[in-house]
Amino acid sequence: MMNNYPFSSNSPKSFNAYPRSDFDIESGTIRRARKFRNSSFHPIRMVKSLANRIHYYYKLHPVLVFLLSLSFGVTILIILSVYENHYKMLSNYRKPDIGFNDNPYAKLQNLVMVAGHSVYTSSNCGKVDGEDSWLLMPYQKHPGQAATFLAHIQKGIDIAAKDDEALLLFSGGETRKEAGPRSEAQSYWSVAESEGWFGKEETVRWRALTEEHARDSFENLLFSVCRFRELTGTYPHNITVVSYDFKKERFAHLHRSAIGFPESRFSFVGTPPSLNSREAALKGEALVRAQFQEDPYGCISKLLRKKLGRNPFRRTIPYPEGCLEIEPLFRYCGTAPYRGSLPWAQ
């Protein structure tokens, strides 16, 4: 019967036929086994090695290494800044949780903006189509001028009545000292109220509101977009602007491009000026349009001085509160279009 010998390593009788040491045949001695370096990852050593290399190259080419380091640092800062702004915009771009479940404006998706051009100064609304009921500038004093204001109001109401998802905003601030602290926007709303909303009170009145801080046509558009966000919790999907027909190029191209709103979702509806004022209006519009071409945001030229003069009661502009996602657009001042992130461009 064969005996089973335990050859396990734990047995005191185990036999190591192949020792781990190296046997030298010539000398007849056993040499210690060669120890191999540990190949594990050493980040500290790598960092030190990289630092030594950089130091070595810096001694050889100090200017080149400095410029490369500076370029790398600036690139990192730019990337961090872009991601920070993008994160802020995304984190802010959400509907407020409090009160918006019962907000009737939250379901509105489209903006209809009527740009104001004058302040109603009459103590009653019996003669809304009379020139003496409005504060008119010298270039506005023409027969039929007041009727053009009513045409804008009615056109805005008609457009909103055909779109159940539209918010109608009358836009214009307290621009004239002689008119007292009354805004163009409130004037238009009051006239619409006196006219019974031209037969569409039931469907339009509850979603017709005001933006009462704009001092020029660019602010009419930008401030109304912010006001829309303030009321609905989101930004308009479509925008329709109502003004004089000769201002189409200014609104549909210059102002729309300045805020980066998609052309396919922007509409302009124009009404004609009074017959006697058209020639002068076209000349004046050409001048203003040229100024906005040079200064798209109205912040560095005669447009700025004109705008400051249209705030006689020292009103503080509340925006961009209510639309913090586009705060950088409000702060931007340049001749080139704004290139930052915008909610409607996502």
Question: Which residues does each predicted region cover?
Answer:
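Initiator methionine at the very start of the polypeptide chain
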Residues: M1-M2, M46
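Low-complexity, Gly/Ser/Thr/Pro-rich intrinsically disordered linker/tail segments
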Residues: V288-Q346
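A structural signal for short, hydrophobic/glycine-enriched beta-strand patches
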Residues: M2-K35, H55, V82-Q293, Y297-G298, ...
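N-terminal signal-anchor transmembrane helix specifying type II single-pass membrane topology
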Residues: I25-Y87
